[in-house]
């Protein structure tokens, strides 16, 4: 376990950057894909922020704006991992592949909370 909480990562531009990020996974990585213009993203923003604040030090959190990281979003979409935004992805420590261990899409509070409870 790390002594300090890692910063929220916001710059995962493409698939190779995602795979590089997964290689340094200290225990768990949670990535939120969204956009400034996305209404459903705004609906779950405070819920996701609260969960991110409660994360232990061995969890990396990432908030990816699909407009600035469109190559990554496009890659995940072509692999049918994401359908749209918002989407939350969970990767456990030994997963070094782009396919997540858990995923939830949409702005349903119950599904978002259940996702975090499952992942932790």
Say what each PLM segment does.
Residues 1-29, 111-120:
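N-terminal leader/targeting and pre-domain segments
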Residues 17-53:
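Local sequence-structure signature of Cys/Sec-based thiol-disulfide redox active-site neighborhoods
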Residues 9-13, 33, 45-52, 56-73:
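Thiol-based oxidoreductase modules, predominantly thioredoxin-like and allied folds used
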Residues 12, 35, 103-107:
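Intrinsic disorder
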């Amino acid at each position: 376990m790390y002594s300090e909480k890692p910063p929220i990562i916001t710059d995962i531009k493409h698939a190779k950057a995602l795979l590089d990020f997964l290689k340094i996974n200290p225990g768990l990585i949670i990535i939120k894909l969204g956009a400034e213009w996305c209404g459903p993203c705004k609906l779950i923003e405070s819920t996701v922020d609260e969960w991110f604040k409660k994360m232990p030090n061995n969890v990396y959190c990432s908030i990816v704006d699909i407009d600035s990281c469109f190559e990554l979003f496009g890659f995940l979409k072509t692999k049918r991992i994401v359908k749209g935004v918002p989407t939350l992805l969970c990767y456990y420590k030994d997963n070094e592949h782009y396919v997540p261990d858990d995923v939830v899409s949409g702005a349903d509070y119950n599904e978002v909370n259940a996702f975090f409870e499952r992942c932790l």
